């Protein structure tokens, strides 16, 4: 399924102090407020990974949020890459991989 001009999907990898600080829960709440679909999960290497799909301004707002995260987080960098369209309904926390 091709992305429309109004809808984008991005893969994020967040580095820094981002586990054990409610990052996933906070990102899930932010994504739901913005109407972004997808998921977020911890990785065993200490990063957080997410897939965000939706209207371009909403996805960009979530990416902007990812650079800050919740108050206890210390984000060092956020890698963002284009991704294939996502057919997720809603935004969920997934298990660590």
Swiss-Prot record:
Residues 9-95 form the Acylphosphatase-like domain. It catalyses: an acyl phosphate + H2O = a carboxylate + phosphate + H(+). SUPFAM superfamilies: Acylphosphatase/BLUF domain-like (SSF54975). Belongs to the acylphosphatase family. The keyword Isomerase does not apply. Coiled coil: none annotated. One of its GO terms (molecular function) is acylphosphatase activity. PANTHER family: ACYLPHOSPHATASE. Keywords: Hydrolase. Its EC number is 3.6.1.7. The active site is at 24, 42. The gene is acyP. This is Acylphosphatase. It comes from Acidovorax sp. (strain JS42).
């Amino acid at each position: 399924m091709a992305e429309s001009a109004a809808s984008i999907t991005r893969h994020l990898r967040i580095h820094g102090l981002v586990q054990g600080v409610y990052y996933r829960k906070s990102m899930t709440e932010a994504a739901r407020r913005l109407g972004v679909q997808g998921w977020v999960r911890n990785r065993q290497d200490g990063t957080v990974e997410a897939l965000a799909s939706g209207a371009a301004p909403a996805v960009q707002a979530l990416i902007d949020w990812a650079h800050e995260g919740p108050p206890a987080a210390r984000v060092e960098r956020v890698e963002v890459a284009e991704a294939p369209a996502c057919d997720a309904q809603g935004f969920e926390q997934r298990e660590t991989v």
